[in-house]
Amino acid sequence: MEQKIKKLTSILFLLLCVPLSAENKKADLIESEAHAILIPGSGTYSKKISTQNKEAQQFFDQGLRLAWGFYFPESIASYLEAARHDPDHPMPYWGMAHAMGPNPNSRYSGMPDDPKGEGFKAIKKAMDRIENASDMEAKLIQALHILYDKDTYPDAKQRDQAYLAAMRK
């Protein structure tokens, strides 16, 4: 019970400290002030990325865990913070694009794909930095780019299928 209270208190503190909406945070703005804090008790899963910056890695991991928990605004804030620590690494921008949508699951509830275009801006930034990615990171970035590629795949179902095929590689 005490662990739950600590976790909820930490999340509440984060909600009070960072903007609650991706609409309020432009994916192309990486400012000097902090966008997020490391939340105690938010998990230990780590997906090593090719950054040499310890803080960027920690915030990337937190962003991934929060996105998997459907805490998308907090996830985006964590990815923004990772990008602040390593602005040339593409994976924080990949994370932002991943958390901002489009999301094949959300379409079933009628949510629009990337209504403000912020996710597209983020994946474009990741693509612009892809030379700084490992081979696996580059494949993840290229696969996620497909979900935003309305020129090649005008139909959302086509994009979903192409994305799934790319992720299977």
Give the residues covered by each predicted segment:
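Bacterial N-terminal signal peptides that target proteins for export
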Residues: E2-T9
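Short coil/linker segments at helix-helix boundaries
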Residues: N24-K169
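Hydrophobic h-region of N-terminal signal peptides that target proteins for export
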Residues: F13-S21
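Compositionally biased non-globular segments, especially hydrophobic aliphatic-rich helices
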Residues: L12-F13, R129
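A cross-taxon signal for low-complexity, glycine/charged-rich
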Residues: M1, A22-E23
